[in-house]
């Protein structure tokens, strides 16, 4: 299938929405930074302009594929006439030694796209592979990432989390309120922060924006519960309580105290060794920055057939 047709089809996993972010713009920037103002001088100087080739993508490690659809967008941006065949799609498991894509067309075009395709795909597949491991261990809790992403690539990183079986936390500072320790300290306490936030959202017509409140101690958990139960305090936008760096026992106690009033989210000290036990506490979500800030790229190579 022509890359242009692949790129225009609906992806198996749509990227998270963002009001000012364009995947096409990110792809164009990645391609432009690679070729600069004179182009791919290696290919231009060694390969005749009309040379046609076939190349394949080879998995050199086992993991979860992510970046299949984005790679088609990259290839189409370089040369819409390239023909691509995908044997695996986003979210599929790929095995070490497996060829999972074939692209045919102008050799210069393939090589111009090569590094950008691999950079996106290796990082995304690394994130998806790690997310899959965490998500499987965390069940029945749902894994979330954080905003600890590569600047300029947040939607790409969060897209990979979706492909790996996780869910997205807030995309940025604009789509969810998180009242954390610094906000609480500056506002003069949890109650002041929540009331001020509810007032702000009401005055600006931001009824779709929800509030998450961080609690670091059981006393703070009880303070939030008291607010939720107080008929004189507006808390309709508060939908989640973050349990920050709490022990397993404290998380179990907090979940029991919350008793379904709002969702709960465990955060802090989340590793592949601890995430299963955290998931058994009854929390709704588990968030980990490691899914995007400590990931290892999945080893994938592109090879021209000879």
Predicted feature descriptions by range:
Residues 229-237:
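Intrinsically disordered, low-complexity Ser/Thr- and acidic-rich flexible linkers and loops
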Residues 2-227, 249-257, 263-266, 272, ...:
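Acidic/glycine-rich phosphate/pyrophosphate-binding loops and surrounding catalytic core
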Residues 246:
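Glycine/alanine-rich phosphate-binding loops at beta-alpha junctions
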Residues 243, 262-263:
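A generic structural signal for short
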Residues 231, 283-284, 304-305:
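Short, hinge-like loop/turn segments at secondary-structure boundaries
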Residues 290-306:
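Short, charged, intrinsically disordered terminal tails
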